[in-house]
Structure formats: structure tokens, C-alpha cells
């Protein structure tokens, strides 16, 4: 099995669920190779680190082994931009600990930091196991640091520099296959169908941007943060190419 990873990361929970599936692949005895695309960062590397061999391009954004959590405080945004205010009634002092409409207090911040530290420890433990390194060695190149594919090769985060075809050929050789055909999953979406869906999505965004005007970007950013579930293992920035 060759897993193609082209991801800046995402939910720590989702990354761990996918990692477990890679562990089941290894238990089955099948060769498990990973080919990295433009990036395999944070959660993207989390799901790759368990592979028998990892291939990357020289410029693949690799690593960013780290975790962060964000609970946005939208109180002022909703009050000043949209005119929505909230009144809270609680059954205990921390019943609304994850509320988006107030800042975190000292105890809530401490609990959040503890949870993030636990997830980071689990992350580095898995990388150390998959890459046959000491956890202290992983920590020395982790903590959110980003590496190129070439640098990642030197520090042991990847095994080879090569594209997807090179990775597939190596996996086939490892499996003892002289003749094989590649099956890509999931199946490619029909281009016309994808175009129609994209146009429908763009229409909704266009209407919303006309209604909100200059507040649209702020709304879209708030919407993205609200929909993040739990601690995140992802790049600590968003790249926009213009």
C-alpha cells in the first residue's frame, strides 16, 4: 500500500484515527510506503510516520511536529459587527469552559495546556516509534519546526527523495511484484461534476460576500475557527497564493 500524503495537517483526533489504520496495515504484514507531495506537515506527518519507507520531494514541507488548540472569543466580533449579544447562566463555574463568547480563565487555560502537552507527547512517541528514534531526538527537531524534504532526509524524518512513481515502484519491489497495476483511491471525480459543484459553492460565497461586504473575510475566518474540532495538529499559518 502506498499512501499519498499532501496535507498541512488538521484535527489531532482525525490524525490519530488514520494513524491507527496505518498500524493495522503494518500488523497485516503488507509493505506500507508513504509518498509526500507539496507538504506533509503536522497531522500530515503524523499519519506518515508509521510507514516502512517515506519518500519526499526535495521541497516538500515536512515536519511541523506540534499541537495547538484555539478557542476563539467571538464576543466583540458578534457584538460590534453583527449586533448579537449573549447572557450566560451556569450551573457551576466552568460549565461554559468551551464557550466561544468569553475569554478563558486561568484554570481553563491550564487544562487546555495540559491536554495539548499530552497530545504532543503522544505525537512524538509515535514518531519516535515509527522512525526508530529516541523521543528526545524527535523533540529536538519537533516543536513545530518546518523542514524541507532535503533537510528532513538528513535528520531522519524521510528515507528517500523521489516522486510518487518512484515510491510505487519501490513498494512493488518490496512486495515482490514484477507485474502490477496502480489503483488510485478514492476514485477521481468526474471533471464536469466537480466544476458544477465548485460553481454552486462559489455562488453561495458570492452572495454572502455581497451581503457582508468588507466583513466577509472576518466572517469566513471566524467560521473556519468555529468548525475546528478539538486540538489541532496542523501548520501554524495559512498559505495563500495570489
Regions found by a protein language model. Give the residues of each.
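Conserved beta-strand termini and adjacent loop/short-helix elements that scaffold enzyme active sites
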Residues: 35, 89-91, 183-187
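Extracytoplasmic
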Residues: 27-29, 41-42, 62, 81-84, ...
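Cleft-lining beta-strand/loop regions that shape enzyme active-site pockets
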Residues: 1-77
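Short glycine/threonine-rich loop-to-helix capping motif typified by GTGT followed
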Residues: 12-17, 151-154, 194-199
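Short, structured secondary-structure boundary patches
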Residues: 55-59, 72-82, 107-111, 178-187
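Intrinsic disorder and flexible/low-complexity segments
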Residues: 115, 186-242
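Charged, glycine-interspersed solvent-exposed loop segments at helix/strand-loop junctions
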Residues: 2, 75-155, 159-171, 175
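C-terminal long alpha-helix characteristic of the crotonase
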Residues: 68, 126-130, 159-201
